[in-house]
């Protein structure tokens, strides 16, 4: 795993697939809400031309195939795009193994997709906009590639409880070490996307109408092992932003052992960690 000090480096680095394979166990809980909000099943546009933008391991694409499997293949097509060659390669293999003849996967930069203008009926971007270096460019690009009457539907994290577990582990270290609040962490790259009002305003500012925004929470349990794997690659980002050089030099290497100890002592070596994560969902249409 690449040691990334910001999210752009993390997504572009080696080993991101391993992290996503763990994270998809959680992100799957939120895919049906995303698709339902889009109104895809009631769409009058035909054929359906769908883009899964920042597709990751393809959890949204999985759900789309489950939902539309009864449709003749000529009635819909799917493009899976991600900036990561590692993730795109994984989805390409999935397409081959599952025989998704109407689907392709390709490397796509959300800010400059190089995809055709006015082509897609629906664009999905699940839990992605906070990771785009330029969200204004990404919004403009989605508007360009949508057909008239097409729909953008997104989700973004508002609250994820794994951060509190890491904070408790850092508190074990015998030093007065700063730690971000959830709000501060969620805002460290693209502030505002954890707010319904902000997301609504960004959709309208980009020219979308019939905008709907809602917040949905899910309760679940994740294994001690998986929570450790989720936190591990993000810790360098936290210490790079909130710790000074002296603190990093002295204590960064203590965090993972402290996290493992805290997890084992609190939940058991093979235990489950109760979690409640909250996401903001939004959808809007391009004018016809």
Swiss-Prot record:
GO molecular function list: hydrolase activity; methyltransferase activity
User: Which EC numbers characterise this protein's activity in its record?
Assistant: 3.1.1.-
What pathway is this protein said to act in by its record? Answer: Alkaloid biosynthesis
Highest taxon above the source species: Eukaryota
- Segments forming a coiled coil: none
Query: What reaction gets catalysed by this protein?
Result: glandicoline B + S-adenosyl-L-methionine = meleagrin + S-adenosyl-L-homocysteine + H(+)
What does induction of this protein depend on? Expression is decreased in presence of phenylacetic acid (PAA).
Binding residues for S-adenosyl-L-methionine: 57, 82, 109-110
Q: Biotechnological application?
A: The indole alkaloid meleagrin was shown to be a good candidate to control c-Met-dependent breast cancer proliferation, migration and invasion.
Single GO biological process annotation from the record: methylation
Keyword field: Hydrolase, Methyltransferase, S-adenosyl-L-methionine, Transferase
| TM region(s), chain numbering | none
Task: Please summarize what the entry says happens upon disruption of the gene.
Answer: Leads to the accumulation of glandicoline B. Does not affect the production of roquefortine C but decreases the production of meleagrin.
The similarity annotation says: Belongs to the class I-like SAM-binding methyltransferase superfamily.
Function (record text): Glandicoline B O-methyltransferase; part of the gene cluster that mediates the biosynthesis of the mycotoxin meleagrin. The first stage is catalyzed by the dipeptide synthase roqA which condenses histidine and tryptophan to produce histidyltryptophanyldiketopiperazine (HTD). HTD is then converted to roquefortine C through two possible pathways. In the first pathway, prenyltransferase roqD transforms HTD to the intermediate roquefortine D, which is in turn converted to roquefortine C by the cytochrome P450 monooxygenase roqR.
Protein name (Swiss-Prot/TrEMBL) = Glandicoline B O-methyltransferase roqN
Species assigned in the record: Penicillium rubens (strain ATCC 28089 / DSM 1075 / NRRL 1951 / Wisconsin 54-1255) (Penicillium chrysogenum)
